[in-house]
Amino acid sequence: MGIAHRKQRKQQIGVSKQQDNLYFVWLDEFHKVQSICLNGQQKDIFSHLLPYLPQKTNQCCFIGAISPHLTWSKTLILPQTLNAQECEQQCRFILQKELPIPLDELWFDYLTTPLKQGFRLDITAIRKESANAELAKYLPLKLTALDLLNHSILRAFYAILGQEPTNALFLYQDQQGCLAVCERLQQRQVLQSQSDLSELYQQFIQRFPETIEQIYVYQTPDILNSRTIELLPQDWLRIETDLPFIALGNALWQTDLKLVDLSSKTTALLTPSNRERGDVKP
């Protein structure tokens, strides 16, 4: 198994884990988002999951996410477009050149982005040992692929917003920590921290001083319900949804987000000061 197997076209089911619970999200035949939460300690978890799925389990692939701090990444801006074979050759060359780790101990993947002038190649690699340790957390469920957490977070934000804002900063927080990600033309900027969102934001703008036009925030329900929740700036826009955020992003791996139907799910875009009053910002 690699970080992502691009030839896999089975029914995708996004998975995330919180304590003993496993959260599953998938798209039905009408591209409507479906979800369920199950106790991950159940011995026969498949018998509980199967009635909800659109296809048989052996026709599904389960997608999880791994923290970017466990991976190595590099972005290349190349003068011309590469085909799949050339991309793979370029990845292998860069990994052998820059990492003191044998290729057979790594899983790697890449993303390609055509530019007006040139071609962007994003390379990600992870030790197989680290990936296997992450996969073991989900057992007895066997994941098919691991994507990067920052990729999943961006997809979830984009799907809920119904757009892919440029020069926007996306902030995510759960009990494990905080993550900031901003998609630029030349690179994807990512920063993780165990601090609060305000401190992470300050660290981010010091490291990446480019202009930020809008800031979007998602905090998991347990963070929002905490008595020690921090006050956020008035111009930050908070995303709220009844869907498990990471599982949603995982489910949308390699999916055309324009087709995703969230009409049956509760989502809201609020300013931090309006959250308790429930005022939704259009």
What are these regions (language model features)?
Residues M1-P282:
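Hydrophobic/aromatic-enriched cytosolic interaction surfaces used to assemble or bind macromolecules
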